[in-house]
Every structure is written in C-alpha cells, then in structure tokens.
From Swiss-Prot:
An annotated Gene Ontology molecular function: DNA binding
Compartments where located: Cytoplasm
Species in which this protein is naturally found: Vibrio vulnificus (strain YJ016)
Pfam families attached to this UniProt entry: TACO1_YebC_N, Transcrip_reg
NCBIfam families attached to this UniProt entry: PRK12378.1
HAMAP family noted in UniProt: Transcrip_reg_TACO1 (MF_00693)
Organism taxonomic ancestry: Bacteria, Pseudomonadati, Pseudomonadota, Gammaproteobacteria, Vibrionales
Keywords: Cytoplasm, DNA-binding, Transcription, Transcription regulation
Domain of life where this protein originates: Bacteria
The name this protein goes by in its record: Probable transcriptional regulatory protein VVA0010
Length: 238
C-alpha cells in the first residue's frame, strides 16, 4: 500500500476522570453491541472482539458485566450510530464516530468542537473517500511471507502486508476481520497480536502546519471530552 500504518491510540489515561470516560465509552459500545446481536460472545463475534479489546485497554470486569446485564434486561436507552466528517485545523481530514440517544445534541456538541477551533464540519462523504475501511492486525515478527502464505491458504483476502522495524502489519477488507483473526489464531496459536481492529486508514497522511499544531490538539481534546464520541480518525502525520 506504500505507507506504514500509524497507531496513534492514546495510552490508557492516568487520571481518574479520563479513565471514567474510557470506561463509559466502552460500556456504551458493549451495551449496544450486545443489545443488537445478543449477549453471548460465542454467538456474537463482534461482542467477543469488543470485550477482548476492552480488557486489553484495562477496562474493569464490572464495567463489562454491567453493560451486558443492562443489555439482557431489555428496554434501556436506544443508541444510534452517527458519523460526522470535516476538516480540522490545518485542513486535516477527520471522521468522528458517535453513539447517541439524541442526534441533535450530539451534532451540536461535535459542531462546537469544529467551530471553536476554526475547523469546518462537512457533509456525509466529504472526507470518507480519503480513507480505506480496513481490518488491521499488528504484531512483532520478521517473516511476513510465512504469515501471508498462511492467510492465503486460509482463503483470506489480504490487501497488504508490511514489515517495518520488526513489526508486521496486515491489512484486509473490513469484512475479512474475523476470518483473518481466526486464521492467525489457528496457524500461530502463540502469536501475541498487539493491534486488531477495524479502522479507517488514511490513503495519505498530511503534516499539521506548525501554527495549527496547538489548535489541532485542542480540537482532538474537545472531541475526546464529548460523551457521545466513540472514535476519531484523521490523516494527521503526528
């Protein structure tokens, strides 16, 4: 693909307040996933992946269990996905994914993040075409060919595989996520996968102009503070 995948996830927040926000976002996402697809992780593969991801991010078991109990009880909030696109400070392409029970409130909250930092919120699709919706797996290794061969034998559709500085990154269509994950776990049972997610990968990265760097970080921080924002994707070269 001619580019390296940049994992820019913030490390686990150290302050109690920030941790609570992370737990809240996972709790909401697990609740929605379980409510829509069932609370049994063995039957709901998306839920199984989400729980695994939450545990990797050190989300306490009681947060996960509470979300599952809430989903099993029926009723509760009716969260809907919402996506907003636009250009952040410095012209950086941005996709903001939310879960909301009040679309008007969420739109206004996200819009204020754009407005207060001189950014521009756009119409649906305005920047999505600049990203590839991919399944991404990343782990330590030095022989990418053996992994590619194993995935080909498992009839997995692989978009690209890269080796850089002792780290192997596998890209596949987002629809192939569970197929690739199963093949890796089956063929390489001792493999420790550091990143396994469905994400929007920028087709090209853009440097943030020096004069916009502080404002861009403020923009990201404001979005992170929005209760309904679940994930932010951008093409900034950090």
């Amino acid at each position: 693909m001619g580019r390296s995948f940049e994992v820019r996830k913030a490390s686990m927040a150290k302050t109690a307040g920030a941790k609570i926000k992370v737990y809240s976002k996972y709790g909401k996402e697990i609740y929605v996933c379980a409510k829509n697809g069932g609370i049994d992780p063995d039957m709901n593969l998306s839920l199984r992946h989400l729980i695994t991801k939450a545990k990797k991010d050190q989300v306490p078991s009681h947060v996960i269990e509470k979300a599952l109990d809430k989903a099993s009880g029926g009723g509760g909030e009716d969260y809907q996905p919402a996506r907003y696109e636009g250009f952040g400070p410095g012209g950086i392409s941005v996709i903001v994914d939310c879960l909301t029970d009040n679309g008007n409130r969420t739109f206004q909250d996200v819009r204020q993040c754009f407005v207060k930092t001189g950014a521009k919120i756009g119409t649906p699709g305005v920047v999505a075409h600049m990203f590839d919706h991919q399944a991404v797996f990343q782990f330590k290794g030095d022989d990418e060919e053996s992994f590619l061969e194993a995935l080909m034998m498992a009839d997995c559709d692989v978009t690209d595989i890269e080796l850089e500085d002792g780290v192997i990154t596998i890209y596949a269509p987002n629809t192939e996520f569970f197929k690739v994950k199963t093949a890796l776990n089956t063929e390489f049972p001792d493999l420790v996968i550091d990143v396994e997610e469905i994400t929007f990968v920028p087709q090209n990265y853009s440097p943030v102009p020096e004069e916009d760097a502080e404002k861009f970080q403020k923009f990201l921080d404001m979005l992170d503070d929005c209760d309904d924002v679940q994930q932010v994707y951008h093409n900034a070269e950090m």
